[in-house]
Protein backbone atom coordinates (compact mmCIF):
# COMPACT_ATOMS: atom_id res chain seq x y z
CA UNK A 1 0.00 0.00 0.00
CA UNK A 2 1.38 3.40 -0.96
CA UNK A 3 0.08 6.43 0.92
CA UNK A 4 0.71 9.83 -0.56
CA UNK A 5 2.60 12.31 1.62
CA UNK A 6 1.43 15.83 2.52
CA UNK A 7 3.18 19.02 3.49
CA UNK A 8 1.18 19.14 6.75
CA UNK A 9 3.01 16.05 7.96
CA UNK A 10 6.02 18.10 9.06
CA UNK A 11 4.05 20.48 11.31
CA UNK A 12 5.63 19.74 14.70
CA UNK A 13 3.52 18.15 17.47
CA UNK A 14 0.60 17.76 15.09
CA UNK A 15 -1.28 14.73 13.78
CA UNK A 16 -3.57 15.82 10.97
CA UNK A 17 -6.54 13.49 10.83
CA UNK A 18 -6.62 12.31 7.24
CA UNK A 19 -7.49 9.19 5.29
CA UNK A 20 -4.37 7.37 6.39
CA UNK A 21 -5.16 7.87 10.08
CA UNK A 22 -8.85 7.30 9.61
CA UNK A 23 -8.27 4.06 7.70
CA UNK A 24 -5.79 2.63 10.20
CA UNK A 25 -7.70 3.55 13.33
CA UNK A 26 -11.21 2.89 12.06
CA UNK A 27 -12.18 0.39 14.81
CA UNK A 28 -10.72 2.67 17.49
CA UNK A 29 -12.67 5.69 16.23
CA UNK A 30 -15.81 3.58 15.97
CA UNK A 31 -15.41 2.68 19.63
CA UNK A 32 -14.89 6.35 20.55
CA UNK A 33 -17.89 7.41 18.47
CA UNK A 34 -20.06 4.96 20.42
CA UNK A 35 -19.53 7.11 23.53
CA UNK A 36 -22.23 9.45 22.26
CA UNK A 37 -24.63 7.31 24.26
CA UNK A 38 -24.67 6.84 28.03
CA UNK A 39 -25.46 3.15 27.60
CA UNK A 40 -22.19 2.57 25.73
CA UNK A 41 -20.16 4.67 28.17
CA UNK A 42 -21.50 2.51 31.01
CA UNK A 43 -20.85 -0.73 29.14
CA UNK A 44 -17.25 0.33 28.49
CA UNK A 45 -16.68 1.22 32.14
CA UNK A 46 -17.96 -2.19 33.28
CA UNK A 47 -15.34 -4.08 31.21
CA UNK A 48 -13.05 -1.95 29.01
CA UNK A 49 -11.13 -4.91 27.56
CA UNK A 50 -14.29 -6.73 26.51
CA UNK A 51 -15.60 -3.51 24.98
CA UNK A 52 -12.41 -3.19 22.89
CA UNK A 53 -12.84 -6.79 21.71
CA UNK A 54 -16.41 -6.09 20.69
CA UNK A 55 -15.18 -3.31 18.37
CA UNK A 56 -12.14 -5.21 17.09
CA UNK A 57 -9.77 -2.77 18.82
CA UNK A 58 -6.57 -4.80 19.19
CA UNK A 59 -2.85 -4.63 19.84
CA UNK A 60 -1.38 -1.17 20.46
CA UNK A 61 -4.79 0.44 19.98
CA UNK A 62 -6.28 -1.64 22.78
CA UNK A 63 -3.29 -0.96 24.99
CA UNK A 64 -3.68 2.81 24.58
CA UNK A 65 -7.40 2.65 25.33
CA UNK A 66 -6.93 0.56 28.47
CA UNK A 67 -4.15 2.85 29.71
CA UNK A 68 -6.17 5.96 28.77
CA UNK A 69 -3.02 7.07 26.93
CA UNK A 70 -4.52 9.92 24.91
CA UNK A 71 -1.29 10.93 23.17
CA UNK A 72 -0.71 7.32 22.17
CA UNK A 73 -4.25 7.08 20.82
CA UNK A 74 -3.84 10.33 18.93
CA UNK A 75 -0.58 9.24 17.32
CA UNK A 76 -2.19 5.92 16.42
CA UNK A 77 -4.97 7.73 14.55
CA UNK A 78 -7.69 8.64 17.05
CA UNK A 79 -9.67 11.70 16.06
CA UNK A 80 -9.43 14.42 18.70
CA UNK A 81 -13.17 15.17 18.70
CA UNK A 82 -14.06 11.51 19.07
CA UNK A 83 -11.41 11.04 21.77
CA UNK A 84 -13.03 13.88 23.72
CA UNK A 85 -16.15 11.71 23.99
CA UNK A 86 -14.06 9.27 26.04
CA UNK A 87 -12.09 11.89 27.97
CA UNK A 88 -14.65 14.52 29.00
CA UNK A 89 -17.27 12.29 30.69
CA UNK A 90 -14.43 10.72 32.67
CA UNK A 91 -13.20 14.04 34.00
CA UNK A 92 -10.40 14.79 31.51
CA UNK A 93 -11.12 18.14 29.86
CA UNK A 94 -9.57 19.18 26.56
CA UNK A 95 -7.21 21.34 28.63
CA UNK A 96 -6.20 18.41 30.83
CA UNK A 97 -5.52 16.45 27.64
CA UNK A 98 -3.54 19.36 26.16
CA UNK A 99 -1.43 19.49 29.32
CA UNK A 100 -0.84 15.74 29.12
CA UNK A 101 0.29 16.04 25.49
CA UNK A 102 2.91 18.57 26.61
CA UNK A 103 3.85 16.84 29.86
CA UNK A 104 2.88 19.85 31.99
CA UNK A 105 0.15 20.45 34.57
CA UNK A 106 -3.28 21.73 33.58
CA UNK A 107 -2.60 24.90 35.59
CA UNK A 108 0.58 25.51 33.57
CA UNK A 109 -1.29 24.82 30.33
CA UNK A 110 -4.05 27.27 31.27
CA UNK A 111 -1.50 29.92 32.26
CA UNK A 112 0.12 29.60 28.82
CA UNK A 113 -3.29 30.08 27.21
CA UNK A 114 -4.13 33.11 29.34
CA UNK A 115 -0.83 34.71 28.36
CA UNK A 116 -2.05 34.77 24.73
CA UNK A 117 -4.52 37.46 25.78
CA UNK A 118 -1.88 39.73 27.33
CA UNK A 119 -2.25 43.30 26.15
CA UNK A 120 -5.23 42.39 23.97
CA UNK A 121 -7.39 45.42 24.77
CA UNK A 122 -4.55 47.84 23.93
CA UNK A 123 -3.72 45.89 20.81
CA UNK A 124 -7.32 46.03 19.54
CA UNK A 125 -7.59 49.73 20.36
CA UNK A 126 -4.47 50.35 18.29
CA UNK A 127 -5.80 48.40 15.30
CA UNK A 128 -9.13 50.20 15.55
CA UNK A 129 -12.65 49.19 14.59
CA UNK A 130 -13.07 46.60 17.34
CA UNK A 131 -15.66 46.62 20.08
CA UNK A 132 -13.70 47.17 23.21
CA UNK A 133 -16.03 47.07 26.21
CA UNK B 1 -38.21 36.87 -3.17
CA UNK B 2 -35.93 35.76 -0.34
CA UNK B 3 -33.00 37.98 0.39
CA UNK B 4 -29.85 37.79 2.45
CA UNK B 5 -29.62 40.73 4.79
CA UNK B 6 -26.29 39.92 6.39
CA UNK B 7 -23.94 37.50 8.08
CA UNK B 8 -22.74 36.89 11.62
CA UNK B 9 -19.76 34.86 12.85
CA UNK B 10 -19.37 33.16 16.19
CA UNK B 11 -17.30 30.64 18.02
CA UNK B 12 -19.15 27.38 18.65
CA UNK B 13 -17.01 25.65 21.26
CA UNK B 14 -18.64 23.50 23.97
CA UNK B 15 -17.32 25.77 26.73
CA UNK B 16 -19.56 28.56 25.40
CA UNK B 17 -22.63 26.35 25.81
CA UNK B 18 -21.52 25.31 29.29
CA UNK B 19 -20.92 28.92 30.35
CA UNK B 20 -24.45 29.85 29.23
CA UNK B 21 -26.02 26.75 30.84
CA UNK B 22 -24.21 27.37 34.14
CA UNK B 23 -24.86 31.13 34.25
CA UNK B 24 -21.18 32.03 34.06
CA UNK B 25 -21.44 34.69 31.36
CA UNK B 26 -20.77 37.55 33.79
CA UNK B 27 -17.90 35.79 35.58
CA UNK B 28 -14.56 37.59 35.07
CA UNK B 29 -13.24 34.93 32.69
CA UNK B 30 -16.28 35.17 30.39
CA UNK B 31 -17.55 38.71 30.81
CA UNK B 32 -15.62 40.46 28.03
CA UNK B 33 -16.28 37.64 25.58
CA UNK B 34 -20.06 37.61 26.15
CA UNK B 35 -20.45 41.38 26.53
CA UNK B 36 -19.06 41.69 23.02
CA UNK B 37 -22.08 39.73 21.75
CA UNK B 38 -24.56 42.42 22.82
CA UNK B 39 -24.35 44.50 19.61
CA UNK B 40 -24.73 41.33 17.50
CA UNK B 41 -27.78 40.27 19.52
CA UNK B 42 -29.25 43.74 19.20
CA UNK B 43 -28.71 43.68 15.43
CA UNK B 44 -30.56 40.34 15.14
CA UNK B 45 -33.37 41.69 17.35
CA UNK B 46 -33.71 44.69 15.10
CA UNK B 47 -33.50 42.83 11.77
CA UNK B 48 -35.55 39.83 12.90
CA UNK B 49 -34.49 37.46 10.11
CA UNK B 50 -37.03 34.76 9.25
CA UNK B 51 -34.39 32.13 8.57
CA UNK B 52 -30.81 31.63 9.70
CA UNK B 53 -28.58 29.31 7.68
CA UNK B 54 -25.96 28.01 10.09
CA UNK B 55 -22.65 26.97 8.51
CA UNK B 56 -20.92 24.64 10.96
CA UNK B 57 -19.12 21.35 11.19
CA UNK B 58 -20.36 18.21 12.89
CA UNK B 59 -17.87 16.86 15.45
CA UNK B 60 -19.07 13.26 15.40
CA UNK B 61 -22.72 13.38 16.42
CA UNK B 62 -24.49 13.09 13.08
CA UNK B 63 -21.65 11.89 10.86
CA UNK B 64 -19.28 9.05 11.61
CA UNK B 65 -16.27 8.25 9.44
CA UNK B 66 -18.19 5.60 7.49
CA UNK B 67 -19.70 8.35 5.33
CA UNK B 68 -18.26 11.84 5.41
CA UNK B 69 -19.89 14.38 3.09
CA UNK B 70 -17.78 17.43 2.27
CA UNK B 71 -20.88 19.64 2.25
CA UNK B 72 -24.24 18.54 3.66
CA UNK B 73 -27.52 20.44 3.88
CA UNK B 74 -30.34 19.77 6.33
CA UNK B 75 -33.58 19.28 4.39
CA UNK B 76 -36.00 18.65 7.26
CA UNK B 77 -38.65 20.50 9.24
CA UNK B 78 -37.04 19.64 12.59
CA UNK B 79 -33.48 19.17 13.81
CA UNK B 80 -32.64 17.51 17.10
CA UNK B 81 -29.68 18.07 19.36
CA UNK B 82 -28.58 15.03 21.39
CA UNK B 83 -26.08 13.67 23.90
CA UNK B 84 -22.73 13.96 22.16
CA UNK B 85 -20.60 12.65 25.00
CA UNK B 86 -19.26 16.10 25.88
CA UNK B 87 -21.32 16.48 29.07
CA UNK B 88 -23.58 19.08 27.42
CA UNK B 89 -27.28 18.94 28.21
CA UNK B 90 -29.29 18.62 24.97
CA UNK B 91 -31.43 21.63 24.06
CA UNK B 92 -34.90 21.89 22.50
CA UNK B 93 -35.34 20.86 18.83
CA UNK B 94 -34.95 23.45 16.08
CA UNK B 95 -37.55 24.29 13.47
CA UNK B 96 -36.42 23.95 9.84
CA UNK B 97 -38.01 24.74 6.46
CA UNK B 98 -37.79 21.67 4.24
CA UNK B 99 -39.18 23.32 1.10
CA UNK B 100 -36.63 26.13 1.31
CA UNK B 101 -33.83 23.63 1.95
CA UNK B 102 -34.77 21.57 -1.10
CA UNK B 103 -34.79 24.69 -3.23
CA UNK B 104 -31.30 25.53 -1.99
CA UNK B 105 -30.12 21.97 -2.68
CA UNK B 106 -31.51 22.09 -6.23
CA UNK B 107 -29.93 25.42 -6.96
CA UNK B 108 -26.56 24.39 -5.52
CA UNK B 109 -26.48 21.23 -7.62
CA UNK B 110 -27.39 23.25 -10.71
CA UNK B 111 -24.42 25.45 -9.86
CA UNK B 112 -22.19 22.34 -9.66
CA UNK B 113 -22.07 22.06 -5.85
CA UNK B 114 -23.15 18.43 -5.54
CA UNK B 115 -24.29 18.69 -1.96
CA UNK B 116 -25.42 15.84 0.30
CA UNK B 117 -29.06 16.23 1.36
CA UNK B 118 -30.10 15.10 4.86
CA UNK B 119 -33.71 14.50 5.86
CA UNK B 120 -32.58 13.46 9.32
CA UNK B 121 -29.74 15.42 10.80
CA UNK B 122 -28.72 15.68 14.42
CA UNK B 123 -27.13 19.03 15.17
CA UNK B 124 -24.24 19.22 17.65
CA UNK B 125 -22.58 22.01 19.65
CA UNK B 126 -21.18 23.50 16.44
CA UNK B 127 -24.73 24.43 15.39
CA UNK B 128 -26.32 24.93 18.80
CA UNK B 129 -23.86 27.19 20.61
CA UNK B 130 -23.77 30.11 18.14
CA UNK B 131 -27.60 30.19 18.24
CA UNK B 132 -27.54 30.18 22.05
CA UNK B 133 -24.88 32.88 22.19
CA UNK B 134 -26.78 35.09 19.72
CA UNK B 135 -30.41 34.42 20.69
CA UNK B 136 -30.23 33.04 24.24
CA UNK B 137 -31.58 29.60 25.14
CA UNK B 138 -35.24 28.87 24.42
CA UNK B 139 -37.74 26.02 24.65
CA UNK B 140 -39.14 27.28 21.36
CA UNK B 141 -36.42 28.89 19.28
CA UNK B 142 -37.30 32.33 17.93
CA UNK B 143 -36.03 31.70 14.39
CA UNK B 144 -36.21 29.02 11.69
CA UNK B 145 -32.83 27.43 11.01
CA UNK B 146 -31.17 25.46 8.23
CA UNK B 147 -27.96 23.54 8.98
CA UNK B 148 -25.20 23.55 6.38
CA UNK B 149 -22.41 21.23 7.48
CA UNK B 150 -18.85 21.48 6.14
CA UNK B 151 -16.39 18.66 6.77
CA UNK B 152 -13.51 20.13 8.76
CA UNK B 153 -12.90 16.92 10.69
CA UNK B 154 -11.40 14.39 8.28
CA UNK B 155 -9.00 15.54 5.58
CA UNK B 156 -9.31 16.15 2.71
CA UNK B 157 -11.46 19.13 3.74
CA UNK B 158 -12.52 21.75 1.20
CA UNK B 159 -10.24 24.70 0.52
CA UNK B 160 -10.89 28.25 1.64
CA UNK B 161 -11.39 29.17 -2.03
CA UNK B 162 -14.02 26.47 -2.47
CA UNK B 163 -15.87 27.61 0.66
CA UNK B 164 -16.01 31.16 -0.66
CA UNK B 165 -17.39 29.82 -3.96
CA UNK B 166 -20.01 27.80 -2.09
CA UNK B 167 -21.09 30.98 -0.35
CA UNK B 168 -21.55 32.71 -3.70
CA UNK B 169 -23.66 29.80 -4.96
CA UNK B 170 -25.65 29.90 -1.72
CA UNK B 171 -26.49 33.54 -2.37
CA UNK B 172 -27.82 32.69 -5.83
CA UNK B 173 -29.79 29.82 -4.31
CA UNK B 174 -31.40 31.93 -1.58
CA UNK B 175 -32.14 34.89 -3.82
CA UNK B 176 -33.96 32.73 -6.36
CA UNK B 177 -36.45 31.45 -3.77
CA UNK B 178 -39.94 32.89 -4.36
CA UNK B 179 -41.02 33.35 -0.72
CA UNK B 180 -40.42 36.73 0.92
CA UNK B 181 -37.95 35.68 3.58
CA UNK B 182 -35.17 37.65 5.20
CA UNK B 183 -32.16 35.41 5.67
CA UNK B 184 -29.00 35.73 7.75
CA UNK B 185 -26.01 33.41 7.39
CA UNK B 186 -24.00 32.34 10.44
CA UNK B 187 -20.37 31.37 9.89
CA UNK B 188 -19.23 29.43 12.96
CA UNK B 189 -16.12 27.95 14.53
CA UNK B 190 -12.52 29.07 14.68
CA UNK B 191 -10.55 31.08 15.07
CA UNK B 192 -7.02 29.78 15.69
CA UNK B 193 -6.81 26.76 17.98
CA UNK B 194 -5.27 23.35 18.25
CA UNK B 195 -6.62 20.78 20.67
CA UNK B 196 -4.38 17.90 19.69
CA UNK B 197 -0.73 16.90 19.98
CA UNK B 198 2.25 18.54 21.63
CA UNK B 199 1.36 21.78 19.83
CA UNK B 200 -2.02 21.95 21.65
CA UNK B 201 -2.85 25.37 23.06
CA UNK B 202 -1.72 27.29 20.00
CA UNK B 203 -3.46 30.65 19.50
CA UNK B 204 -2.20 33.16 16.91
CA UNK B 205 -3.85 36.50 17.72
CA UNK B 206 -2.15 38.27 14.81
CA UNK B 207 -3.47 35.77 12.27
CA UNK B 208 -6.94 35.86 13.83
CA UNK B 209 -7.18 39.64 13.57
CA UNK B 210 -5.89 39.62 10.01
CA UNK B 211 -8.51 36.96 9.15
CA UNK B 212 -11.32 38.99 10.72
CA UNK B 213 -10.36 42.16 8.91
CA UNK B 214 -9.77 40.46 5.57
CA UNK B 215 -12.91 38.33 5.72
CA UNK B 216 -14.89 41.52 6.29
CA UNK B 217 -13.27 43.60 3.54
CA UNK B 218 -11.12 41.41 1.30
CA UNK B 219 -12.20 37.76 1.60
CA UNK B 220 -10.28 36.71 -1.55
CA UNK B 221 -7.12 37.18 0.56
CA UNK B 222 -7.93 33.96 2.44
CA UNK B 223 -8.07 31.96 -0.79
CA UNK B 224 -4.30 32.25 -1.30
CA UNK B 225 -3.77 29.75 1.54
CA UNK B 226 -3.75 25.99 1.26
CA UNK B 227 -5.28 24.09 4.14
CA UNK B 228 -1.75 23.06 5.21
CA UNK B 229 -0.78 26.71 5.44
CA UNK B 230 -3.89 27.58 7.46
CA UNK B 231 -3.25 24.69 9.87
CA UNK B 232 0.41 25.61 10.24
CA UNK B 233 -0.62 29.11 11.26
CA UNK B 234 -4.00 28.67 12.96
CA UNK B 235 -3.76 25.09 14.26
CA UNK B 236 -5.42 21.90 13.09
CA UNK B 237 -8.79 22.86 14.57
CA UNK B 238 -8.32 26.45 13.41
CA UNK B 239 -9.11 25.12 9.94
CA UNK B 240 -12.75 25.72 10.94
CA UNK B 241 -12.19 29.35 9.96
CA UNK B 242 -12.83 28.33 6.34
CA UNK B 243 -16.53 28.15 7.25
CA UNK B 244 -16.59 31.90 7.74
CA UNK B 245 -15.88 32.16 4.02
CA UNK B 246 -19.13 30.37 3.15
CA UNK B 247 -20.95 33.09 5.07
CA UNK B 248 -18.85 35.81 3.46
CA UNK B 249 -19.31 34.50 -0.07
CA UNK B 250 -23.08 34.70 0.38
CA UNK B 251 -22.88 38.46 0.95
CA UNK B 252 -22.23 41.34 -1.42
CA UNK B 253 -18.61 42.11 -2.21
CA UNK B 254 -18.79 45.36 -0.26
CA UNK B 255 -20.56 45.11 3.07
CA UNK B 256 -21.17 47.33 6.05
CA UNK B 257 -19.16 46.15 9.07
CA UNK B 258 -21.72 46.61 11.85
CA UNK B 259 -19.70 44.96 14.62
CA UNK B 260 -16.29 43.44 15.16
CA UNK B 261 -15.35 41.73 18.42
CA UNK B 262 -12.36 39.57 19.27
CA UNK B 263 -11.39 37.83 22.46
CA UNK B 264 -8.64 35.37 23.42
CA UNK B 265 -8.37 32.99 25.02
CA UNK B 266 -11.78 31.41 25.31
CA UNK B 267 -11.03 27.89 26.47
CA UNK B 268 -8.34 26.93 23.90
CA UNK B 269 -9.33 29.34 21.15
CA UNK B 270 -9.26 32.82 19.75
CA UNK B 271 -12.90 33.88 19.27
CA UNK B 272 -14.32 36.40 16.83
CA UNK B 273 -17.72 37.97 16.24
CA UNK B 274 -18.41 39.80 13.00
CA UNK B 275 -21.72 41.34 11.99
CA UNK B 276 -21.71 42.17 8.30
CA UNK B 277 -24.70 43.76 6.59
CA UNK B 278 -25.59 43.88 2.91
CA UNK B 279 -26.35 47.31 1.50
CA UNK B 280 -29.94 47.45 0.31
FE1 LIG C 1 -15.63 23.09 16.29
Please provide the spans of the model-predicted regions.
Chain A
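Charged, low-complexity intrinsically disordered segments
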Residues: 1-133
Amino acid sequence: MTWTTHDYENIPGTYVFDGKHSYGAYPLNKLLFSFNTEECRTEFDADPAAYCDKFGVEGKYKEFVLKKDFLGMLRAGANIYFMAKMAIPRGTSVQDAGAQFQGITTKEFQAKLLAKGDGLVERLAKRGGYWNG
Amino acid sequence: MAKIIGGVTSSHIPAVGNAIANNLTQEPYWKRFFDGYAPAKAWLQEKKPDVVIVVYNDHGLNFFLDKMPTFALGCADTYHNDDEGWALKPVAPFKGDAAFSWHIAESLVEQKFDICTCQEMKVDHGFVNPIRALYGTHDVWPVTTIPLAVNTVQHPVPTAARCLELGKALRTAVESYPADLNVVIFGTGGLSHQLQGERAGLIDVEFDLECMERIANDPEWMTQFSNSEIMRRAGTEGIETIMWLVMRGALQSNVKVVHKHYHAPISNTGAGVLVLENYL
